[in-house]
């Protein structure tokens, strides 16, 4: 233990953990870039997320099997929780995110999703009456001001589509925040890896069923580029970052891993500019600084009553 009472991390674990957390955050951020590239080939959100989940399903089933070895059998209550979390945390959050990316830039999408810790804070207050400190309130206001700054700039040239896209992505962030708030009990009982493997597998199946219900089978005929981009999305930007972040948390703890995630919005903006030729100007810089600073303060000061 350190003098401050926090657990000390061996230098080797600290370096490896920071590297894993950074790589995982960058890989997660690449998802929006790949989705935007795929949309250039005339595919829609329902079909695109179907292919992403089709290729991700075997990986998460394998993770669920590996994490379940020697573990107790799941009860009906466990399965109900897994299905519920799969719907909110992975199916609904993913679909709304993909849909929203049809209308807004990858940079704005990542900034909205990065508000997630503030949404968890608000849900904690609404559901459990956990107090929000004055510092956290100011930090949240700063974060949302940053998003509004970038949104206002984007709405000037995207029009009503920017409003729809931003609302869809914000809905995705809320859905994932609900998952985080309610997943605590199951994480303790099942373990993080087992829960992620099972809940994501549920979401994968739901995305496949959604395609069958909403689209003719002929809609599955897409450009080869969409297939390869979906494989890349499922592996490099979905499965791999989950593993990397979990390994990082084991080495450096959830708090430091979350703070390292600040690299996510910046990497998305950089990739958006370099790969998608998205705009980069003072509005985006200022908005990003506000969002990242506000979320850092929220995570830095923690949630009262959550420990």
Task: Specify the residue positions occupied by each region the protein language model found.
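Specific transmembrane alpha-helical segments of multi-pass solute transporters/efflux pumps
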Residues: 27-32, 61-113, 123, 149, ...
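Helix-helix packing/entry segments at the starts of transmembrane helices
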Residues: 25, 51, 108-115, 180-205, ...
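Specific alpha-helical transmembrane segments that line the substrate/conduction pathway
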Residues: 47-58, 89, 94-136, 172, ...
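Glycine-/small-residue-enriched transmembrane alpha-helix faces in small-molecule transporters
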Residues: 2-51, 87, 158-185, 206, ...
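Hydrophobic transmembrane alpha-helices of multi-pass small-molecule transport proteins
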Residues: 60, 83, 123, 132-154, ...
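Hydrophobic/small/kink-forming positions within alpha-helical transmembrane segments
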Residues: 29, 86-91, 95, 117-122, ...
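Transmembrane alpha-helical segments that form core, pore/gating elements
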Residues: 21, 36, 60, 120-122, ...
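Juxtamembrane helix-entry segments on the extracytoplasmic side of multipass membrane proteins
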Residues: 12-18, 42-50, 74-80, 152-175, ...
